[in-house]
Amino acid sequence: MFVLNARHLMAAGLVSLAAWSAGAYAGAVEQLNAFVSNVSTARGEFVQRQVKGGTNGSPLRVAGTSNGDFVFSRPGRFVWRYVKPYEQQLSADGQMLYIFDKDLNQITERKLDASLGSSPAAILFGSNDLAKNFTLKEGGTKDGIDWVELTPKAKDTQFQRIAIGFRSGELQGMELRDAFGNTTLLTFSNIQKNPQLPANVFRFTPPKGADVIKQ
């Protein structure tokens, strides 16, 4: 299972799922399908927020914020780089996933095919066959953003709820809620669709002296 925690990858969204209303424009499901079908490469920036609360009437509070940039080429090749507050990089070359923690000078290595599955990363970086791993439905519109909810078909997934938002076909954010009630929000910006990418952009070279942990 491809799961990235507060200092790793994936999660997301812009707003709470609770207040959504019916949407306009093309439906969110249609926008998502168009995105995964028509965008084979992309690069952009993100802000990731870990949110606590929101259950039993408790207020939402931001427990942590990080930001960075990403680049991907479907299927299964990407670099997801955290810049602040900690430097960390996740690199996938289509076969292997490498998670490099600069502070620890440590690399975690695992096979990518066993990592994507029904994970949030599969939505952004995987193939365009979303229906194989997810059930999709319209999530409504909030503040001009159309949302689609994705429910993993796998029973052993960590995530109870995944949502991804678009505005006029442009990717805006993701939201993840795990089995423990924790929510991660991702806001995307400065996205370039289908840029020409250097051939070696997804080639990971371990830094000298780094510890390597194979999983």
From Swiss-Prot:
Gene Ontology CC, one term: periplasmic space
Alphabetized UniProt keyword annotations: Chaperone, Periplasm, Protein transport, Signal, Transport
Keyword Signal on entry: yes
Entry superkingdom: Bacteria
Record-stated family: Belongs to the LolA family.
Official protein name in the record: Outer-membrane lipoprotein carrier protein
Subunit structure and binding partners: Monomer.
Listed Pfam families: LolA
Disulfide bond sites: none
Lineage summary: Bacteria, Pseudomonadati, Pseudomonadota, Betaproteobacteria, Burkholderiales
NCBIfam families (UniProt xref): lolA, PRK00031.1-3
UniProt source species: Ralstonia pickettii (strain 12J)
UniProt function note: Participates in the translocation of lipoproteins from the inner membrane to the outer membrane. Only forms a complex with a lipoprotein if the residue after the N-terminal Cys is not an aspartate (The Asp acts as a targeting signal to indicate that the lipoprotein should stay in the inner membrane).
Subcellular location: Periplasm
GO biological-process terms attached to the record: lipoprotein localization to outer membrane; lipoprotein transport
Record's signal peptide: 1-26
PANTHER family in alphabetical order: OUTER-MEMBRANE LIPOPROTEIN CARRIER PROTEIN
